[in-house]
Amino acid sequence: MENNVLEQVYGKNVFNDEVMQAKLPKDVYKSWKKTLENGEDLDVDIANVVAHAMKEWALEHGATHYTHWFQPMTGVTAEKHDSFLSPASKSRPVLEFSGKELIKGEPDASSFPSGGIRATFEARGYTAWDCTSPAFLKEDAAGVTLCIPTAFCSYTGEALDKKTPLLRSMEAISKQAVRIMKLFGYDDVKKVSCSVGPEQEYFLVDREKYLQRKDLIFSGRTLFGAPAPKGQELDDHYFGTIKERIASFMKDLNEELWKLGILAKTQHNEVAPAQHEMAPIFTTANISTDHNQLVMEIMKKVAKRHGMECLLHEKPFAGVNGSGKHNNWSIVTDTGINLLDPGKKPHENTKFLLFLAAVIKAVDENAELLRLSASNPGNDHRLGANEAPPAIISIFLGEQLE
């Protein structure tokens, strides 16, 4: 690719605000933004115009299908592809995409995990457009597909995914934080957002060697074996010089992520041999979560192109560090105030101290729920032992705040 690749490719496969402003009539764009900012119901007429613009943009980029892209309780994403084709009376089929098709989908929910909250005879499930997370184009062997981020629920409204609880929690935090800000006299604050920047640690191994290990293939980790002759005893792999083969992978990975508007910022060797890390710039929590799912999917695809396998299991090898998603979480007002920023005089910053105390109280009273959210077989293999963090919930404030 030519020089200045970042500027050339960044966001090219995303139906972002800049594209919407260019594709939509001014009055429709203003109405859309108002709906988004105020959290109001989307007018059907506006939805039809947005859907048409989205379809035309996707067709310009070679798309033939669209999908409601959602995150069931499987740990990975799900999608069902529908083409833009609609039957015409006598002539050739026409290409259509309506506001109704944009807003709501109807995948079968019968075979997705539900935790027992969905009645077995109610097989129908619904996807609902998360209009706060931009649509994007996915390029693969199937061609180009327009992916619309959505929430997923049952026929009777129970959440069957991981996004719906996240959106609800973001709304709950916004509602209470706005209430507190008004008590401090910040009447101009209308919304408070959570921001997250989750890093992604991973291992890269030669694909030929990977295919010789059935335990890695079927479980994502080694179940038996001998320790490596050289592990991480010298800490010389951490931040070490990146090898050419890995650097080539990272270059391709960055370009794929930038196309999707993912702010891939930092890359380096991690502690364990063959372990590496990619860290993005933070963004709104639900968008950041969508991005992390895409990061993991793209890492695996790009690794195969380079004759490698990307291992995302939290503890693929015994005796060396595992992989995590350390992140920086914060809450920010729509006027740009970081509510967890202590400032130069934190002991005098009443607003900061109040929100900090609220976070401490929430962690203290809901430690079990927080621990449960990170409890799965892979993570439980990783937590504790010689690694940080331990398998308990704790808060470290630093000497000044303590």
Segment roles from a protein language model:
Residues M1-Y29, G125-W129, P134-C147:
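Catalytic pocket of metal/acid-base enzymes, prominently hydrolases
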Residues N4-Y10, G39, E270-A274:
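Short N-terminal helix-initiation segments at or just after the protein's N-terminus
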Residues Q8-A123:
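Active-site core of metal-dependent hydrolases
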Residues R124-L312, F317-E402:
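Glycine-rich, acidic/polar active-site loops that bind/position phosphate-bearing ligands
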